[in-house]
Amino acid sequence: MKNGNEAAKDDAAKLKAYLGFSLRSGKIVLGADKIAETRRGVRLILADSDMGKTALKRLKAAADESGAPLYLYDGRLGELLSIPAVKAAALKDKNLAKAAEGAVCAGEKWNLYSEGEI
């Protein structure tokens, strides 16, 4: 049986893998501006909790319009993506979004900011 720390590492590793699959398949949108432009087809939005208010407002509007949940990460999303400058990402594939949301919900560093349905 795994302790809480080991389970959290497993969830982070799973999320990192799902984000990697999304990158390789082109089913991810990176950056608040691009997410706000795309909106349609977005299934899950992930962002750093320390994003600027304007960018966060745009992500919330994109989440509301697309019906996608928006989760804020108390860490660096870019590190999970291996692209340090990235502060927001949106998954477009339904199955990857569901799997990623499962890993996000199990993690302690994530908070639901805006509800939605994948």
Sequence positions of predicted segments:
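Long, charged, low-complexity intrinsically disordered regions
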Residues: 2, 6-8
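SAM-dependent transferase fold signal centered on methyltransferase-like domains
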Residues: 4, 32, 47, 108, ...
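N-terminal first-folded block
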Residues: 11-47
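Positively charged, polar, low-complexity stretches
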Residues: 21-26, 30-36, 54-80
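Structural motif
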Residues: 27, 43-44, 69-71, 87-89
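Small/polar loops that bind or transfer phosphate-bearing groups
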Residues: 47-48, 92
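Glycine-rich phosphate-binding loops at beta-strand->alpha-helix junctions
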Residues: 49-53
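C-terminal structural segments of small proteins and small subunits
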Residues: 78-117
